[in-house]
Structures are given as structure tokens and as C-alpha cells.
Amino acid sequence: YYAVGCALLTGRPLQPVPAAYRAMAELEMKHVAAARDDFSEFFGYTEVKYPYSLYRPRGHYTRNKSLERYFRAMMWFQTAPACLDNDRQFRAVVMQAAVLSDHPEDMKRYDDLMEPIAFLVGEPDNVAVRQVADLLRRGRYVLKALMTDDATLEKFRREVKVIAEAQNRIRPDERFELSCRDKINLMPQR
């Protein structure tokens, strides 16, 4: 996830990615570059296409390569979803939130980026990793238990679900829902 975002931002090759994920990360890079909706094993979009067309730079972001890279990276971090109901994806979010929570200087950088956006554009539609980090801290959860114990993970998932139910405003009618209902993003779009 982060290797793809970093490569999109810098224009450099992917940083080392574990062998099990290398091909998947390379495929994500190709999909983003093509900017055509397609299936994504990485995001679990195997029955419906993921909207890679969102990654096509537009407006002033087309002025130069640097702005195009910035646009694609920001879209990646804003739209690349983790599904609350998918254990693998949810555990990855929990790990991200724990790392963020354990590093106050990184949490401050994250807040310094997100707070002006929230002020100017409003609160996010999906749950943010920051909110998951706050719940981890308040609930005094042990990361190892969340990674290995399904009952603990399910209890925590219910707490995140409360946020999702109150906050997520953009949802398709359940009859037409093609992807997961509740998504978590590093930097959710508004």
C-alpha cells in the first residue's frame, strides 16, 4: 500500500516489497497508470471493477509531471479502501493505526495535513485511520490480540462500525451495492 503510494508520488520504482505482494503492487501501478476501471485482487474488487479512472489527472494537475504524480498519490491515499468487514484488510488498518498511534511525531504530521483539509472541505465520508488509532488508544487494545484473536478483532470492529454508521454519508442502495459497505481510508475523501 505505502510502496505504491510512494512510487506514485516520486515517480521512482517500487521500494522493496515482500515477494508475496510484489506482483500485486506492480499490477496496481499499471492499473493506476492506465487509469481505466479494472478488477483488483489487492482491494478485493474481484466481481466489480475498481474505479482506477479516478487516477487520471485533471485540471491544473495536468500542468506538469510533478503535479500529475502528486494527484495520483493523493488519490491513492484518499480512495484506496480497506473494507471493515474483510479481516485481512481490517487487520492491516489496525496495524497502520497502531504504528501511527505509537509515534506521536507522525501523528502530529498526519494531523497537520488532515486538519486544514477538514476545516476547508469538511469531515470525511469514510472512517479515517486516525479515528481507528484513537479507538485503539481509548479502548486499551493490545495489538497482538487484535492480530491473532478473532473475538477481540470482532469487538473492535463493532466499535469502528459505530463510527462508520454515524459518519459514512455516501452509500449506494443495498440492492445495488457492489463493494463493501463500510470503508476505511488513510485520508478519506470528502
Model-predicted regions and their roles:
Residues Y1-R190:
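Long, non-catalytic protein-protein interaction scaffolds
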